[in-house]
Amino acid sequence: LMCCKFNKVPPILRNEGWLLLCDVNGKTRLDMVSNITGQTYLDILKSTGMPELNHPYRILYTPNSGYSDSPFYLLTADGATRLNKNSFAWKEEYAFKYEVAKQTDLHPQSMICHNAMTNVCVSDGRMYYALKSGIQGLYTEANKQSVLVPYIGSNLVASAFASIYLLYDDVNKCFMSCCPLLPAFGLSNDTYHTMKEMEAIAVGFQGSDMVTGDAFSEYPTGMDFVYMENTYYDPGNADMGVTYTVLRDGQKYYLYGIQLGDMYKSGCPYAIGKAYYGDLSGCKDINKASCYAFSSLRNYMYYAVGGIVYRVNLSEKPLKAEKQLALNGETITMMKFNLYQNGASQHDYDLVVGSENNGVGTLRIYDGMVKEGDFATVKPTTYTGFGKIVDATYRERTN
């Protein structure tokens, strides 16, 4: 259990370690665990000159964003900003409004910067995209109504060209999709379509094999959104990682797995795959789940209730929950699999858990390769002394 605290990170140590986004009485604080020293450093943005930001959402490492000097995005209710790769230093030009057409002051809650051609985000119910063809384009609006949940489904495995993104309209209660390059191909004047429309465009452009899978026949409508997550998990080994979405219909909970490809077939064998369907309603206390996480190693889903983590084997029907671990006296505030960006890593499969007890945050990392996704007997690496952890990302080595 490591809880040493220092306020400032020595520059030489900044090249690798965990970045922990904390909510401290509603204020944003960024803490770090150095993988070099094993020590923790609190409030590392305090002396950077960055204005105080309220209600943190996400901390992202985005080496493919197009901003090589500042590959970190900090997302908060007060807006978003990039951070310098070497010192986390802040400049006014890092403020997200300078990346948006007309310098509109957006407040993105989610962002995907994996694709070679586009960056996308959702802010206040609308999706925005920026094209990266030669020069860094500005973000423009994809849909007019503020109806979208702050999650984006995307293929994180393939190096796609004309990516298709998955969205959920929580007003009209249906999946939607966006392909920013549709107008460039002359396939549609709009980038934003229903799933059935996007399927029809893909089939008309490249043939019937552009849509595959029979896990479900029709896309669901009328259900409430619960959660969405992108994974590297692909049962067909075709660079088509599954995006999972949890939906609720009254007291019933359902899971849909959708594979998202490329309209141009660049690096992807098809455009859309209906990969998975399951009924989660029989899983213990699923209606009380506060956090979800999906493995990229095995077909497993994890969810947290209070301080307890359950695992669901998605390959076994009917779906049922198996208790994995209990953090007595603690409340789990964040749970994820950190998907590494600089290359394949076995640590993609490590379960990362943030918890809180009396205002003190603790980070635990459970090695995913010891029991291949069964964490019940895995002893975690533990760090404590943080604020309430709302997100974490691993700061990988950078040049």
For the regions a language model picked out, list residue spans one by one.
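Preference for solvent-exposed, low-hydrophobicity sequence contexts
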Residues: 70-292, 296, 376, 388
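Acidic/polar, low-complexity intrinsically disordered N-terminal segments immediately downstream
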Residues: 1-75, 344-345, 356-399
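Intrinsically disordered, low-complexity segments enriched in Gly and acidic/Ser/Thr residues
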Residues: 249-361
